[in-house]
Amino acid sequence: MKKIAFLFLLVVFTFGAKAQYRNLYEKKEFIQKGDTLRYRVLFPLDFRARRKYPVVLVLHGSGERGNDNEAQLSWGADLFADPANRNKFPAIVVFPQCPKESFWVTLSRTNAKDSLGGFRFATDQPPTTPLLLVMELMKSMVDHGEANPNQMYVGGLSMGGFGTFEILWRLPHFFAAAFPICGGGSPEKVDLYAKKFPIWVFHGGSDPVVPVGNSRLMVKALKDSGAMVKYSEYPGVGHDSWKNAFAEPELLSWIFAQYKK
């Protein structure tokens, strides 16, 4: 009985701590030409207005789309909000939310065994409205002086992994590092950014939603283009490889060690 009570209290404490961490992210809106991007932002513990900070942009998956400005914090937010990490890596962390009816990228499914890893990308079209707003938000943070332009980082999971690869070629000179998780991208676009910053790619070896071939394809294209790329593939792991990625002990130290050339 005591053991059950202890486990119950442990679960309550864990969920309470996570909720408390997520409440540290302030609710914001970025409005441009009548379009609204809802996002959450975590500021450093000792934030000073005139100091420039690293910025980490995290793009969520399709399951976290909506307009509640809450769901996008489901994965990864606790890692950056952990007090030890905030002390060690002072940074501004941004979690935007894509509306339910939209996506970070425009793509369509094809044969999962074809050369594009099962997806076709509309690279001849402008970015989706949510991604465009994210791009403009990032630029505005640099323009307003709160962001260090040499330490802008981007990563994301699933749909956000696709969004990460997408924003890299649309803003090829903007970021210092990227960490796409269980996503994919356009191999023909990697030359635009391959040699500009390091990339750490993650994927589950048994992913039934976004086949692992998507990341393998991008990693090969990046290596062929001379990129500094790391690849972590988790055997037997399904689509939720973001759990493994965010648990990587070197992830944060790797991210914040990168500076734009």
Show which residues each predicted segment covers:
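Primarily recognizes the serine-hydrolase "nucleophile elbow" in alpha/beta-hydrolase
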Residues: 139-193
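Active-site machinery of serine-nucleophile hydrolases
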Residues: 64-131
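Gly/Ser-rich "nucleophile elbow"/oxyanion-hole loop immediately N-terminal to the catalytic nucleophile
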Residues: 46-51, 105-157
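Alpha-helical scaffolding within the catalytic cores
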Residues: 74-84, 182-192, 213, 217
